[in-house]
Design a protein with these regions (language model features):
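Non-catalytic N-lobe/flap surface of aspartyl protease domains
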Residues: 1-190
Length: 190
């Protein structure tokens, strides 16, 4: 069946594209500023490193929430506590709501006795930083920093199933003040 789109629908699509472009620009501008604050250096262009599939890789079923948001399930702790998270390419921080992540139920959690406060382009969260085992698609990383939010900061997301943000960005963009090896990306290299 053919459908004819009118000028109003085209404007709506353009508004969405414009809004999405502004979101991406703001995200990367914030990342560049955080990188500079953490390292004292300006970001450079990708250094041309050849990427190859690592032995510690797996596959994960992802669901697209909207045009720029991917959602999937990870496990935190021992035994693993399943968490549905939004993957965040703009930060290495992992932040989970307190009603979902229970460090006292994990044999491998450690309270760093350190607080955090982060603001994303939407939700903000504050709480305590722990380290624990994190497993994504069968790839296990130890001693990963997890911000356990003192509130359910993701409560505005659809269906109420998303309990946190899972950072996949460069460790130098982090705001937890932990060593690179305590981010998920850093820990998988060990």
């Amino acid at each position: 069946k053919l459908r004819r789109y009118g000028a109003e629908e085209d404007l709506y699509k353009m508004d969405n594209i414009d809004r999405q472009a502004k979101f991406v620009v703001a995200k990367y501008a914030s990342n560049a500023q955080t990188f500079f604050q953490n390292t004292g250096k300006h970001q450079t262009v990708v250094n041309g490193t050849t990427l190859s599939r690592r032995a510690n890789s797996g596959e994960l079923e992802l669901h697209m929430l909207d045009a720029a948001t991917w959602v999937g399930e990870v496990e935190i702790g021992t035994p693993g506590q399943k968490q549905v998270v939004m993957f965040d390419s703009g930060s290495p921080n992992i932040v989970i709501g307190e009603d979902s992540y229970k460090p006292q139920d994990s044999l491998t959690s450690k309270d760093l006795d350190k607080g955090f406060e982060v603001t994303y382009l939407g939700p903000s969260a504050k709480g305590t930083i722990y380290t624990d085992v994190v497993t994504v698609a069968g790839v296990k990383a130890k001693h990963v920093a997890i911000g356990r939010s003192s509130s359910d900061f993701m409560n505005d997301k659809k269906a109420g199933k998303i309990v946190g943000l899972f950072g996949l960005s460069y460790p130098s963009l982090g705001s937890f003040g932990v060593p690179d090896k305590n981010t998920y990306i850093g820990a998988t290299k060990n």
